[in-house]
Amino acid sequence: GCSLKDMPNGSTTYNGLQNPSQIKGTWQRYQNKETSSDVLTCYGYGDGGGGPTEEMLEQSRRMEEGVAGVPRVHQTFAKDFFHILEDNMDRKCLPSWCGELYLEFHRGTYTSQAKNKKYNRACEFLMGDAEFYSVLAKVMGAKYEYPAKDLEKNWKLLLINQFHDILPGSSIKDVYEDSAVQYEEIIQSAGRIVNESQSAVLSVLEEENKKECLAVFNPLSFGRTSVAELSGEEAVMAEEYRNGSCPENISVQKTPDGSTLFLIKDAPSKGIGVYEYSSSVRAEEEPVITSLMTDERGWPVSFDTPFFHMEFDGQGEICGIRDLREDRELLKKGAVGNELLVYEDRPMEFDAWNIDAGYREKKWKFGGVMEFYLEENGPVRGCLFIRRRFMDSVLEQKICFYPHTSRIDFKTKADWNESQLLLRTSFPLDIQSSEADFEIQFGNVKRPVHKNTTWDQARFEVCAHKWMDLSEYGYGAAILNDCKYGCDIHDSVMSLTLIKSGIFPDPQADQGLHEFTYSLYPHRGDFRRGGVIREAYDLNCPLIIQRENGIKTESWSFLRIAEENIFTDTVNNAEEGDDL
């Protein structure tokens, strides 16, 4: 055993050993002794370790009899403890905390094992789609049985992979090999459910008319104008579409890789729109990018879009973004946007878990431009292509502009072959605000963007889901993403962490190919008035388009929501019964 003189401060940890040291440490760290002399302590091997043991139960029994210098313990249920606490309160007020309980530790878990996090985001959206389209088929009267067992199996498999060492990126290599196989199982199963339920929906709309149509599925709870893509054999009719047979409220564009892009106007909310081809010849539509100027190498220097005047420096970096709607420059004077920086990332401990406060002290530009040119330009989108090299890694980006939204997409492929280096992108913006908004689960949280206190300084890396936003009165900008979670906004600089390649516990973490998209979205008003939430959902959940024959040309919505501040995220069958 141990004597109390050997443990003057006790011990506390998430592995509760239920010994005198543990109990003493819990009592010493308890801050509200004047309010109640009872405190709840949990015991057992945590961190996936198996829970309480026989030895712990015996130690607890002995401590109930009393150990000198150690508070007396009593076995009870958590519910009973709160009843005791309520009785002891005697109208006293317990202190409360309003705001975020920020953990000043393990900031790297927002980014480590990026492929796993991308799988998770994709599967969450895909499972939501599978549930909704299954409901849609049922509500529209199709001969389709709601696949409750398959959906439950997929959700449970997805939740297993949200275990606290898998999703954060702090497991060994074998775990991620198994996890990738399981995510692919979910994608295959949920993808099959989506295809079968959509086919069932289309069967309800069948008619003898054999005219060719485009069927557009929108799983989101708001009507939207957005881009949909057909690839492979489905895209072979691009030339026919461009020659005027496409429906009048749809623009079309062929991409260099043979896919066909469609700009769908006003796709119905949580439903399907069917559009018949038009026989009239349409006028040539203006491309998104105009007034393009290039240097002697053919690299873009400046151009206009419906929303911006863009300028690039001799290194292929964005040095000007003038918002034509507001006639204002978005970037800080002398700064560059989408600045890709590589930082040395060697935390003092817990390599995959941590990012240390001094990581910014050693950094390099992800320079070495190999190619930079206008890759595609049409009525649906205009895209620049740029390829860069840093040491043994290559990064390719398509920077895409659109006619219907001020969102600028950075579609990224990175062949990453570095260790203990961290990649971030930054946008220094000419927007003044003392706080910013970050998305959390089904909500958002405000955080300061200054460094007044040590608490503020400690928030050099925070968590966000699909978006973060910096707005002043009447104007702002958001950074959106399709699979990233670590970010930071300080002194009007918005930064998103893209890759963190630690070497423990997985020596090959984050090596190889990465594909992801992040976006800059300047907007009027704050994030609510500027439509940031909808734009982030649109990035993560694109429209689905199919070529069909012999179906009714009509639109059908499961629901419509008039208020922009209300969003229906999930529609599914009840767990029991046949209700929704």
Regions found by a protein language model. Give the residues of each.
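Catalytic grooves of carbohydrate-active enzymes
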Residues: 1-205, 219, 473-546
